[in-house]
Amino acid sequence: MFRKSLASLVPILLFVSLTNAQQRAEVSLQLGEQFFAAMLDSIYQNFNPPAFRLTGESGCGILKIIRESGGARTAAQFRDGQIRVPLAFSGNYAPPFVGCIEFSGWADSVLDLEFDQSSQKLIGRSRVIGVHLDGTGGMGSTAIAKLLQSSIDKRLNPIEIFPLDKLSFGVPIPSTGTLRMRAVGIRHEVSGGVLNLRVTYEFTKG
């Protein structure tokens, strides 16, 4: 009974303590590599691999981001203050005078996060910094890297991570009203092998 009363009392005290001045607080969310590994496993078990067109409109010129290739797995890694994203892939393209050829390998990429003030969204931009092709000794990797980055820029960047309105919510106050918790800002930090997201909330009477 005491716990139930205390649980009801806390939101009431928060609601009553609000004045005309807006009050703010910060909430921290910590995401580790294991979280993204489980999420990627679920994606590849339940959906088709993400696919991008590299060139033209014919059947040749498709790249798929797959779970694993050549011992490398698509993943999110938090290293040295960066979000490193190895991308395993397979696909095909048609170099001049050669015809359609198949390829596979993995790309080393970095995901840069930023808060877009105008759209009120946390967004990411993927940068390909290297491509490793299976069984070619590096031949053709530069061309594939350019095609991959161009396709990502056209069809993926910027990547919407968190729109702030999806992080906002209301807390019902019994017999009184609603405490609105509106997300007004978000910042991030990569350290200790985890991604830390800090969301700033503004508290108002609803």
Kindly give the residue locations of the regions a language model identified.
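Extracellular/lumenal and peripheral-membrane lipid-interaction modules
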Residues: 21-206
